[in-house]
Amino acid sequence: MAVGIFDSGLGGLTVLDAVTKALPDVPLIYMGDNAHTPYGVREADDIYDLTTAGVQHLFDRGCDLVILACNTASAAALRRMQEGWVPEGKRVLGVFVPLIEALTERQWGDNSPPREVDVKEVALFATPTTVSSRAFQRELAFRAIGVDVEAQPCGGVVDAIEDGDMILAEALVRSHVDALKRRMPNPQAAILGCTHYPLVEDVFRAALGDGVAVFSQPSLVADSLGDYLKRRPEMLGSGEPAFLTTGDPKSVEAKATIFLRRKITFEAVG
């Protein structure tokens, strides 16, 4: 039995690591589309095609439930997938919902009208495609009113992390935070809207300064998955744990080992 985790590259390993710690008895199959990363500058149709292909690999491996641990895929492809592609008996979940639950302190099953929440000014850091989709703002509007969201497209950060150039990644983060703070000097909360960003979370926190509540996805997604599986234990599929990639396994293994600080063996898929 296994739950699938899909990402455009290595960022989803932050989610996998959090899920492994929170739910050690849940086997996981990870699928990284490293051959086509990053998704953050691609067109929506391209992202949809790549995401469905990646998720299909996980379905073929016996997963009934797949987490899109990629905000760009969640923003650009998830709704379309859920409306017309996901087979009966399968589920694909995104990573926005746990964030919004935490930010608004409202459970997703709470279908009462949107209401005012304590947080009024929110900084959103995400890929260019996620920002342009306005998916986060759209989902937030179902739950809260009176929240000003200032979004910063963080071009180059994912590329630098995937290339292992953390010095460049950290410099880009500081630049993007400075750019946002010129438009919103004192955000109450900051959303790290990409699963790569926890790898540079300390840089975001330092650049934002004290007093800003930073919401990072891995632990929120892990907790949400735990709650979901308590309600739907039948969604644990029949697959065996594995790490899959569309890229070069040896290259991906080397970078993934640095991220997780443990040896991982990847298997190539077409």
From Swiss-Prot:
Disulfide bonds: none annotated. Keywords: Cell shape, Cell wall biogenesis/degradation, Isomerase, Peptidoglycan synthesis. One of its GO terms (biological process) is peptidoglycan biosynthetic process. InterPro entries: Asp/Glu/hydantoin_racemase, Asp/Glu_race, Asp/Glu_racemase_AS_1, Glu_race. Pathway: Cell wall biogenesis; peptidoglycan biosynthesis. It comes from the Bacteria. Its EC number is 5.1.1.3. It catalyses: L-glutamate = D-glutamate. The keyword Isomerase applies. Transmembrane segments: none annotated. GO terms for molecular function: glutamate racemase activity. The active site is at C70, C194. Substrate binds at D7, S8, Y39, G40, N71, T72, T195, H196. PROSITE patterns: ASP_GLU_RACEMASE_1. Provides the (R)-glutamate required for cell wall biosynthesis. Belongs to the aspartate/glutamate racemases family. This is Glutamate racemase.
